Amino acid sequence: MQFPVEIWLRGDNHATTETIAPVARDARVWTDADVVAVLEGMLRALERAKNPDAAADRSVALRGFSWIVSPFESGGVVIALELTLGAVVAGPFDVPESLLTAAIARVIDAQRATTGSIH
């Protein structure tokens, strides 16, 4: 499944658009692994915008950013991530906001549980 991501780098006056395809399935049937792939794809797109030579398979941790699933004006929902580096918004996706919000919370919590805490 291909979808657009809008990327804004902090300090820039404009956003850019890129199309990514991290998963094959439609959003309504995403598994937790698909949700992880979507979030990682969004973070990698943001990294490529800042560092075009960044490795495509660079490891990604699902922490250190704020996120929200929001309704899109023409239907569906978008996923927005914000980091110190900038922000990236993907979608729209035809899936209930509550389901996608729960899936993102679940995969972020699961990764946090496996990586431990840093003090």
What are these regions (language model features)?
Residues 1-119:
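Positively charged, low-complexity terminal tracts
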